[in-house]
């Protein structure tokens, strides 16, 4: 029995579960998706909260610029490029044997400075927020001060008496570990069995304590949370429930809005924007989607992408059970090459807060991630890790859906011809060359 019903009963009441348990790629367009004005209050946060987070990141820019010289050119603002990928779009169209109208772009969070993934947004933001709180409470900072003073020996001495811990499959741990260690905190990252060895090695090289588990992500988070709870001076970054992480991700939307405007891209009802977000536990894509809905309202359509073996958010929202259900409950093993998305139980906070704001959810097979990885490198010269390619099939999934979604949303041929499609590329620039070469070899072999 699974939450009071047999598997057959679940498959009868929710036919999509047959596809999920069969590990087949599928898409589900959310019949409960509602207008932004109606659904945004579900989140319990608003535009003022995002503005507060954005202002905090600006206050920290002088410190970031000093501590991480690679950010000096951007004035200490951690941001990624927006790239057109027309050759990749043509390759996708050829492979589908059909036109893919609209224009395809890629948001290269894979190339964010400091930790090379989307987690540099939420993870670093939460560490900075905690550092600011401590510095203000201890008289080290006054409102209006130059935050570059947080690079001082006095600041390091203060932070060294405090710990920061997190549970991670890899990328969140990298962003939090690197930032916390740089400030002087005692940093600990609790890593699941899925975490890549190079990510553990990189953290240790930064002086971060890495605690390894032979269990999955949810168990690593639970153990990390328990250990941190025993130390009053340790701040635990809770990927499943953190509002600070969520807001750090949400700031991305206002920056994307400026980049699109600079590129001459219109976004309105007649020029819709589709954004395809890889989803693990849900904090990153949830926060970004929340920001996007605040920035663009109903003109933006957000879809979450998950591996066929780790469809935790789709399963949680589809059944309405959210974090009460895991993929393992349905016999799905949560073993995927997309290590950043290898999560069996979704964030209950994100699932409930965002369930009327996300247009759809789809799954991607591991082999397909490798094929797309090789295609992107071949057509655009961009190298991403497998997780980061989950957004790439999104354009075809939207244009080929047969669930009445486009009709319900008023997405006719004219609007689709003027649409912008955006793959949110979540990581990859820090993958060691030998490992990346292995990914490419596998992808090319699968393409044949």
Swiss-Prot record:
InterPro entries: D_Ser_am_lyase, Ser/Thr_Dehydratase, Ser/Thr_deHydtase_PyrdxlP-BS, TrpB-like_PALP, TrpB-like_PALP_sf. GO terms for molecular function: D-serine ammonia-lyase activity; hydro-lyase activity; pyridoxal phosphate binding. The modification N6-(pyridoxal phosphate)lysine is found at residue 119. Its cofactor is pyridoxal 5'-phosphate. GO terms for biological process: D-serine catabolic process; isoleucine biosynthetic process. Disulfide bonds: none annotated. The keyword Lyase applies. Its EC number is 4.3.1.18. It comes from the Bacteria. PROSITE patterns: DEHYDRATASE_SER_THR. Transmembrane segments: none annotated. It catalyses: D-serine = pyruvate + NH4(+). Keywords: Lyase, Pyridoxal phosphate. Pfam families: PALP (PF00291). Belongs to the serine/threonine dehydratase family. DsdA subfamily. This is Probable D-serine dehydratase. It comes from Chromobacterium violaceum (strain ATCC 12472 / DSM 30191 / JCM 1249 / CCUG 213 / NBRC 12614 / NCIMB 9131 / NCTC 9757 / MK). The gene is dsdA.
